[in-house]
Amino acid sequence: MKLCRWYIALFLLPVCLQSQKLPTRDEELFQMQIRDKALFHDSSVIPDGAEISGYLFRDNPKRYFFVVEEDNTPLSVIVTPCDAPLEWKLTLQELPEEASGEGSGEPEPLEEQKQQIVNEEGTELFSYKGNDVEYFVSSSSPSGLYQLELISTEKDTHFKVYATTTPESDQPYPELPYDPRVDVTSLGRTTITLAWKPTPTSSVMKQPIQYCVVINKEHNFKSICAVEAKMIADDAFMMAPKPGIDFNPFDFAHFGFQSDNSAGKDRNFMPKVSSSKMLRQITKPKVDIQKFCIGNKNIFTVSDLKPDTQYYFDVFAVNAVTNMSTAYVGTFARTKEEAKQKTVELKDGKVTDVFIKRKGTKFLRFSPVSSHQKVTFSVHSCLDAIQIQVRRDGKLLLSQSVEGVRQFQLRGKPKAKYLIRLKGSKKGASMLKILATSKFNKQPFPSLPEDTRIKAFDKLRTCSSATVAWLGTQERNKFCIYKKEVDDDYTEEHKKRDQNQCLGPDTRKKSEKVLCKYFHSQNIHKAVTTETIKGLQPGKSYMLDVYVMGHAGHSVKYQSKIVKTRKFC
């Protein structure tokens, strides 16, 4: 039993009429299809045993047809909505019987056959409205012309249709196990483990199956078709063609779509525009959805999730031969809350050392005296930049990235409490010093210029000395220079390890100290000082460090500089 493949014949008919006589009934039936716009407007034909994809414009029905030529034929029709719910119905019209013509085999005249079909309204066999993957199955269907009509009243949408007259042997969709649920077997703050029972299509029928897991924060999906439509909703090539952009109105009329002004307004048809402007108009934001195809494993751990967040999980069994899929019953779960951290209390005017793990977070609290006009936060980030947020009684006052030394002064409020949130670097662990005070005094950390690099003068380099310069500020500070011999293969990794700006001169050997001096300049543009480091060995590499000392004894280190003396002089 076959579904009639009319779409091939429709294209070949004009050529065949000239060179070869088609069977009489088929030829007349095809001609009737072409002329009968009431029945076959924008029509398509469903092939037997193949899944087809289609696109619906909102409120514009689409019809598919197939012929069952013998009675008592098994029949299965499956419709898969993608982007939006569908309304669809399946109707049957009996085919006109061929007259014997006194044994001549001549059929009834074409007009009589056509009139019989047109006069028959057909019998509705099944109808459905929703976004589920829905089936029509019959073990014994009568012969006749079957019409599948689909419409989307919500929005333009994709869909899939599959029909077969041999449902027992085809089975292109994987079969679900007796318990088709997806179970959550393990739950953490950033990970969730899922498990499900294998499909009999793999374990019993030995067909190649792979499982695809889909994770998102919105809802469960009922088909891979719906997942893929959501994932690529912002791709221009997936958008429905629009008159004036992809087709002109004549093309649309040719394909069976109305092209009058009212229809254009309903679908927001636009005049001809440039491709770049068109892409800006139709581009949608990307959806937060992930899809993993994991082979034939039926256990999967999802990682890198956010704490205290609800996620929806779906599993699809995919036939590797037909690429057709079946959805398990999805589930949802909320990750555990972030472990509540102990909040450190800051004492007024005292420097506190803070260590933060990679990508970690620390919370500090500051409760100044009840009556205060201003609050000052001084932060010294020892390694990479860190993020700081300050809230006063829940209201966000400050959100900044801090590298080096920064000072923030905020307006106070009687009896206010301040919560400080510190977020570490993605590169590695973070270290910092922080001071909070409601008193007006000198900050604990010395002021720094914007550029904390040390410059070496190559032309002034000798076999036993190196001349360097660095910037200062308008504030009088004490600067100390230290030197350390390093190997020629001293790498950036070693340099990074030595770049902790919070380690002061007290961690250095006395033999490494070169000198200390005071320096400042009222003219910020002339705040430059130079120094010649002597007593070096020929052809050797040295790491030079400059420390600037604060009023409270806290120091800040400039960026280290590697210099190499001349080997021959």
UniProtKB/Swiss-Prot annotation:
Cellular compartments annotated: Secreted
Signal peptide from the UniProt entry: 1-19
Domain Fibronectin type-III: 261-332, 446-565
Record SUPFAM superfamilies: Fibronectin type III
Superkingdom, natural source: Eukaryota
Entry keywords, A to Z: Glycoprotein, Neurogenesis, Repeat, Secreted, Signal
Protein name, as recorded: Protein NDNF
Native organism: Xenopus laevis (African clawed frog)
Lineage, top ranks: Eukaryota, Metazoa, Chordata, Craniata, Vertebrata
